[in-house]
Amino acid sequence: MSQVPCYTIINSPDLEVPNEMQLKQDLEKGDTNHKIETLKKVIKLLLNGERYPGLIMTIIRFVLPVQDHTIKKLLLIFWEIVPKTSGDGKLLQEMILVCDAYRKDLQHPNEFLRGSTLRFLCKLKEPELLEPLMPAIRACLDHRHSYVRRNAVLAIFTIYKNFDWLVPDGPELIANFLDTQQDMSCKRNAFLMLLHADQERALNYLASCIDQVHSFGDILQLVIVELIYKVCHANPAERSRFIRCIYNLLNSSSNAVRYESAGTLITLSLAPTAIKAAASCYIELIVKESDNNVKLIVLDRLIAMKENENMEKVMQDLVMDVLRVLAAPDIEVRRKALALAMDLVYSRNIGEMVLVLKKEVAKTHNVEHEDTGKYRQLLVRTLHTCSIKFPDVAATVIPVLVEFLSDTNELAAADVLIFIREAIQKFPALSGLIIEHLIEAFPQIKSSKIHRAAVWILGEYVEGPQIIEVIDAIQQTLGDVPMVEAEQRRLSGDPTEEQSQQQGSATGGVSGDGSSSTTTSTSNAINKVTSDGTYATQSAYSLAPVAKVEKRPPLRQYLMDGDFFIGAALSATLTKLALRYVELQPDSSAQNRLTTRVMLIMSSILHLGKSGFPSKPITNDDTDRIFICLRTLSERTPEAVSVFMHYCREALGKMLDAQHDEDQRVLKEKQRATAKVQPDDPVLFAQLSNGRDNQLGENVFESSLNQALAGTKTAQLSDISSPNNKLNKVTQLTGFSDPVYAEAYVNVNQYDIVLDVLIVNQTNDTLQNCTLELATLGDLKLVERPHPVVLAPHDFCNIKANVKVSSTENGIIFGNIVYDTALNTNVVVLNTIHIDIMDYIIPASCTDTEFRQMWQDFEWENKVTVNTSFTDLHEYLRHLLKSTNMKCLTPEKALSGQCGFMAANMYAKSIFGENALANLSIEKPVDDPDSKVTGHIRIRAKSQGMALSLGDKISSSQKQSVQAA
């Protein structure tokens, strides 16, 4: 099968297949157009498995002499796919006539026909046909047209590779051709042949013209780079001979050549100058290339370079160059560039990096783009990481980030507050600066979520004289108190205190002799133009009153919209501030004044929630929280005071410590995963050929070829680690008592499934047209229909079928085997093959904010009830993670201990980019150790299939655990 070329299957409608006699008549008597259509039809039928041995002579007699170019092209395809040998493997006699036709086409005056024929000869696998044509092929090397010459080189290359005895002097012939050739495409093909057939001649040619390499065309330069890489990898002593050539190719006009040259350079040399030159070349490619896919690929190469410790030290000086990539509009490119810069930055250039990021922040205020909000969030997180990693720059970063609090984009503002919360906890010296800017930005915040977080930070960290300042700022954004009376005055049209103050400031200079009303009435007169063009005056007193929509303060507006969660958070903050003020202020009257003021605000919120003015009433939970705050202020019991004064900050400190420990654990695992091979590790034979002392590492050409042949890298490694892995994936399709036995090995690759089906004829009869018919359910698609085979008695064969996968859903493959015997046609129904969703899901991680946002956005939810024999909460969680390939986002410290219940978030991504979220909520009685775990799992995904498939997987894993118990 390895000798059979690969074909492109052209789908044709299921019409009646014409018989051989009809095709012969059309080819004999039809005109040129009719012959073209008939020839196309014959080619499609041959590709679909039909056999017409009697047509060959008809085509030789009536079609081959036609000089039409379209027919010539179709004939090349026909001769490529038609069987050229008889049943005993001997060449058909008719092919001698075809060989003569090939020779005439190779001597045809039309250069396109010559070149097409030469390309066709590259695909022939019959040396008997090629041998008489060798003189004509050699003569084409001297043709005047470059199209003929370059295809002649390819033909000689292919023939030499397959049948070197047909052209024993091939390398010498092509080397002489290369010396006299001027066309770059011809030189490229000739050099490519020498590269694979005779590297010594290729090296001699390169050495003779190494100073002119920069003037060659890009197609030849790419082959030269490949040669240098292979030669230096096989013989590292040659590096010094060709490294200057690679340096010169870094300045090539072709981006492809520069990319390959940079990759080759860092494999040949780890000198700082080489690393810097290659990295700078990569960065220039990213900046100048417009294709985002190219940018991402080159960024991945830079990230791979950074993983090498020696290269990372050199690349640290290129941080500012990496930040030039931020000019790209694509958010993924920016995300990777910022992550790379963050890994490379160090104390010397952190200041410059922060300045660049500040400029990028300023740019986002003036640009409205689809991804502007995400980019702002990205910048905030990067500045956050910079400040935590290098505390010296935190003071300059905080004022820039606080400006984001007034942004309408909640994501960026929420990340700013997360940064502020961590900075104020870790750097107490900056608390004064942070609080000052936070109070200043507090009235401009536009989101209740951001206001809640800001209020919590202010209540937790404000001390001393700033307490009164914070309470004043809160009351200013809350409005008049009591709020119910203020809303009643607003509805009745009476001016509130705010409006009175505004009007008083506006008319403060008016005298009391009645001139104020005169001025007002005069200003209320409106000039109008009548139909005849004259002016008329209309008094404001004659106009109907127009309802004026008045804007409420932000916090008041949240409460009027029914969001009383902000009221509960506000009450907790005011309670903390009042308790802290009581500790600092010895004067009891001042204590009582502030406490009364704070309690009035809380009671006013409660009154407003039950008054009917807001769009939704206050909830019982928020009411209880506010009552607790009021009781704490009135009774001031030590336990309650400690909760408000100390426990909240301690909880934050523990959470940040847990996050830091988790980050360190992940970093150590990553370093352990990328560790070099240890002395006591088993050594694979593939590594023995290179040796561990080889600085050039693995040959990328060989590794990519091996990976392509073995499928995905993960599948290849799993087969090596477990020799029985393939046997575990064998699915029995029929019974042993069936006349035809079938079993299949399901090989799951990244985007397709390969079924290797073994079919055994268990009868004493010959089975004609034994066909494997398959169909699919779910998001699976059969790529091609397997061809029918003939099975002798007790014979067997292997049939492969490809199934394309385009999404993460459970799929089913079913079908039957149809075969003909001497008496009738029989059908054997196959067992169904279930495709496991777990082959396409990989664990992933995200932040809590991203998880909540996706949980809110995804519309499909699947709730699975826990039904298991497990009696331990942690064991069930581990079983769930193992059976779903998901990652637990909840920190280990938050899950430690036995308290009778557990809640955890889990996340995974598919290889198609789909996200899967899961929330586990389980419990069991603490006093009954033998009781089973109960609860439920909620799954959310963007697509219905993903949510249902993951739920089915969880349900099936639970059934297996119950049956095992």
UniProtKB/Swiss-Prot annotation:
Annotated stretches, region: Disordered: 488-526
Oxidoreductase listed as a keyword: no
HEAT repeat residue numbers: 128-165, 237-273, 274-311, 313-350, 392-429
GO molecular function: structural molecule activity
Keywords assigned: Cytoplasm, Cytoplasmic vesicle, ER-Golgi transport, Golgi apparatus, Membrane, Protein transport, Repeat, Transport
Entry GO CC: COPI vesicle coat; Golgi membrane
Function of the protein: The coatomer is a cytosolic protein complex that binds to dilysine motifs and reversibly associates with Golgi non-clathrin-coated vesicles, which further mediate biosynthetic protein transport from the ER, via the Golgi up to the trans Golgi network. Coatomer complex is required for budding from Golgi membranes, and is essential for the retrograde Golgi-to-ER transport of dilysine-tagged proteins. Required for limiting lipid storage in lipid droplets.
Name this polypeptide is given: Coatomer subunit beta
Gene: betaCOP
